[in-house]
Structures are given as C-alpha cells and as structure tokens.
Amino acid sequence: MKVSRKLSIVAISLFLVVGMITSYDIIQKHRSSETVKMAQTKQSNLVDRLTSATGSTIHVLNYSDLAIEKMADVYQLSIQEKIQEQLLQLIESQTATFTQPLIVSNPFLTNTTGLYLAFSTDEAVKISYRIDAQGYPSFEKNLKQNEEYATSHQYQIIGCIPNVDNLITLTAITQDGQQQQMQFHYTPPKLSTTSEMNYQLSKQESDESLSEGLFAVIGNQAGEKATYLVDNDGYIRAEMPIVNYNSMRLVFNDQQEMFMAVSDSKIVKLNALGQVKQVLDLANTDYLIHHDYILNDKNQLIALATSKTAKKQAGYVEDRIITIDLSTQEVTEIANFEELLPDLYQKATGIEEHSNNKGYLDPVHINSLQLADNQQLLVSSRETSTILALKPDEQGIYQVEYMMGDEAIWQGVGECGQLLLEKEGSFTSQYGQHSITYETAEDLSAGQYYLSLFNNNSTIMDSRIDISLAEIADKTAGKTSKYMKYLVDEKTNSYKLVESFDVPYSAYVSSVQNYQNHIIVDSGQQATFAEYTSSGKMIQRFTQKTDTKYLYRVYKYDFKNYYFD
C-alpha cells in the first residue's frame, strides 16, 4: 500500500502553530551526513557549546552578529526576536517536506540537545517520533499540534542523548490510519553544565511501573546552572541552561507556554519551540525572587521575594510576597511578614549562620507557596517550622488567617499562638519543612483540603536564640526526614496527619509532589530523588553521580499540551 504524496512548500511563521510536526508513509530513508552551517564566521564559545551541525543536513543559525557571550544574553527578548527573524528567513528559503524537513540545532539556545523541525504535507497528519542511540534506551513521544491532524508543522524535538549519534524516526499518520516514516541522524553537543548524562538507579521496593513523564531536576551548586529533564531510566533528555540561582518550578498556562525562572531577577515565558516569548525582568525593581512562584487566574505570577531596601537597611531577607502582572509587568507587594508578624520579629533576632543568607536576619524564611482558592495563599515558613494561611481582608490587604505548627515555637510570641489550628491526634510537628502541596478531593467536605510537605525534620533555627528545636523535636530530628500529608479542616479549625513515611535526611531544600497517584520525593542535600507508590513503597531511586550533593527540587511533568500530545 503506497500512501506517499509530494509535500507542498509552506512558509511557516513562528507565530503559527507552536509545536506541529508531521510524518507519513513507511519509508526508512537515511539522509546523507551532509552538515549545513549557516555561519561562515566564528561563533561565540557559548553558541558552539549549545549547537551542533553533525548529522543529516542539520542547520546551525549564524549568531556571530548577536554578541551572545553568556546565558544572560540568550534570555534577552531583543536577541530572541533577531533569532526568530533569521529562522523565518531560513524557513522561507527552503522547500521543507516530510521526507526533507528543515532541521535546526537548538535555534533559540534554550535546550542544548533540542532540535527544531519544520515542514508541510499535502494531507493532514499527526506526528510521533522515536529516538534511538546505541547502548541507550529508546525515547518515544507523540508531538503536540494545535489540531489533531494538520498540514503545517513545526516542533521542538527533545530527548536526544548528548554527544552520541542519535537516529530519529518520524512517523506521520493520516486520519484513515495510513503511515509514513522517515529517519535522520543527529549528534548533539555535550551537555554544557555537567559532565554526567544520567543518574544512578538503585533500590526498588515495589514492582509498580513508574509514572509517565519527565523529572525536572531543578537547582544545583555547579558553576554553570541548568534545569534538566530526566527520563525514567535516569537519562538527561533536555538541558535548559539558566543564568543563576535556579528555576524553582515550571509553570504552564493554557496557551501552550511555560514560565521558567532563569535568575533571581528574571522569569521567562517559553513556547514549545524553545523560543522566549516574554521576559519578566525585576532587575530595576526593589525585589529579588526566591524559592517559589505560581500563576493565578488574574494573569499574574505570585512570587516569593526579598526587598533589596529591607535587606540593605534592616538586614531582613526572604519575607515578602509580590505579584507580577503579565500584561503590564507591574510589580506589587502583597505581603510583608514584618508587618504581619511584628511580635515574631521582636523575638527572632538571631543572625542566619548556615544558608546563602549568612549574616542577615531571616525570621520567617518563606520557601514555598500554594494558591488555595485564587485568594487564599498557603505559605511555608522554614524558620518557624510553620505553614501559614493568608487571606485578603475587605480592603484587599493580606492577613494571617491561621497557622499549622508546633505551639512551643509560638509560646510568648504575642498572640500568634491563637492562630494555630488544633492538632487532631498524636503526632510530631514538621520542622524546617519545604515544598508544600495543596490538593482537594471529591470526597472531602467544604472547608477541607490535603496538604503534603517535605518535613526536613531539621533542628536548625538560627533566628531564635531563646529556644532550641533540638529540645522540642523528637529523637528522629536531624537524622531522618519525612513525607507528610495532612487533612486540614477549616470548619473545625483542626488538622490531622493522614500519611507519613521516612525519606533520606536533608536539613535544607528538598521537595515532594503527588503525581499520577505516586509520590515524588527529592532529598536535596543527598542529591537523590525517588518515586514512591501512594502507600510509600519506593519504586525507583535516582542519585546524582557527581561529588556535588545538592538538588533544590525535583518535580515530574508529563509535558502534555506543551511538547507532547
């Protein structure tokens, strides 16, 4: 059965379908190993590290006039727009078909091993792909299109193994089920920020299969930083280099776009092709962002922040919450914990001695943020080992509604202790916790929700010289961390522990995530993460192979409606 047709030429705009690709017929055709490099002049060292022309007619754009020397240059909107213009010119100069697609190595310089593909077909098709590299697991995905079947296609292919020959097979399927395939080769560059391309696998306690998706490994202590997408076999399938700090989390909107922090003053919005579409730059504001940010339904990002003025004048850090308007980029402070908890600030006079804020005052150290009902904010305060619920009053000013934590920490701190919910049952509170996660369920009553967290179970609290966590916590503190899940009942002003299990100890950082009926846990200071069953049985552990032992967070995403269908 022959279903091959000539594929027509289409000038494909980058504003058009962000992530469409097509393949169709069964033809296993190896293209020549011709390399096409657009630049005739020397590219910068960074560009050379992020692109490769090795493979089957692989194009590399000419960046020589763009003065790209560092990742901060890559994440400038003006640079991205010039890259887009050059890519459009290349598209218009090509007769891109399914059997001879336009292939460009990492054109926007935001994914070291990524490929841009563009082509058109006479007949509407949907596209899938498989990547094979000798000695490595295969990687197969269905690509996201704006329509299920389409004739104009452009995509980012992720999943190539760095610095080895990858055979990429595209499959196009028509609406009546007919298929066509084509193949090409690509050898990406080495990863630009790490010498390791995989994580060590170990220790299985359950034979359940791992969930579908890629682990986003966020934050390390390497000189050059990146966020990595890691498959279930432990291999890095994408490297997204950043400027400094860490990406905190990946946040998606409904327009097939992803927000990613690239520094402590900049969050960018990327489309599925890897193109930077918006830059939220706080460099000229009074704020540095840290730890966490989320998207609300008012076209705003809500972010944890440090006031530069307060840091300089009073020494206070990591105690503000701001909103960033995505339309106007206006930054508004919505919470200042010095004003919300003045009695605590009178008590918490100890100087930070252990973290990156050494030498400053860190009375609350807000490290995680969740949005409960588009108004109520749930925040994790590491330094007080407390989760706080904030809600705006009639004037729109956020106030502390209630708290969850050890009452011993709040004894003698004004009337703050009266805000604590009652603990239902006998269990030890969390200490130094990170990464809270809010969830609802159909079987819960009004006013009830689940709250999961990584209980670091740490006894470090530099801000309070009047009490010692070591004297308050139980004997496991400082030895074993825990995954914990609470059922919170706002109507009875109480909460209870419904699930808990031990995980490797990490005094700082770390994360938990409830994902596809499994639990993802990162013990950051041991540079290890694992996927567990819903009952706490380990399915697989992943451990960083380098000597640097630090992973800020690990969250898993399926990337559906972004890269994949």
Predicted regions and their residues:
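N-terminal processing/targeting junctions
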Residues: 9, 149-150
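Short extracytoplasmic/periplasmic juxtamembrane "stem" segments immediately C-terminal to an N-terminal membrane anchor
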Residues: 35-50
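Solvent-exposed serine/threonine-rich low-complexity stretches and specific carbohydrate-binding patches
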Residues: 134-148
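Histidine-/acidic-rich catalytic cores in large beta-rich domains
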Residues: 48-51, 55-127, 131, 152-154, ...
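N-terminal leader/presequence segments that precede the conserved core
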Residues: 13-19
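Membrane-interface motif at the C-terminal end of an N-terminal transmembrane signal
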Residues: 19-36
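N-terminal Sec-pathway targeting helices
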Residues: 1-13
